[in-house]
Amino acid sequence: MEKKKYSKRYCRYTEAKLEYIDYKDVEMLKHSLSERYKIMPRRLTGNTKRWQERVEVAIKRARHMALIPYIVDRKKVVENPFKI
């Protein structure tokens, strides 16, 4: 079997020179979530370790504040979960 090679990805937060990630900005957080609202790993998003940790904390805060659901039903999985 051949190993999958991932293309080189760059951290969008480092390039944007952000100071912090706001948990209320769901549009920015959706780039780090899968269609089932799971947090995507660094190798897929291209985030640095520092920003990945900050994204995880922001997503967990947004979930706690009910801005993002914890789980999604299989039947309700859509192409873009933020346009329901």
UniProtKB/Swiss-Prot annotation:
InterPro entries the UniProt entry points to: Ribosomal_bS18, Ribosomal_bS18_CS, Ribosomal_bS18_sf
GO molecular function annotations of the record: small ribosomal subunit rRNA binding; structural constituent of ribosome
SUPFAM superfamilies for the chain: Ribosomal protein S18
Gene Ontology process terms (BP): translation
Transmembrane regions: none
Complex formation: Part of the 30S ribosomal subunit. Forms a tight heterodimer with protein bS6.
Function: Binds as a heterodimer with protein bS6 to the central domain of the 16S rRNA, where it helps stabilize the platform of the 30S subunit.
Record's protein name: Small ribosomal subunit protein bS18
Gene: rpsR
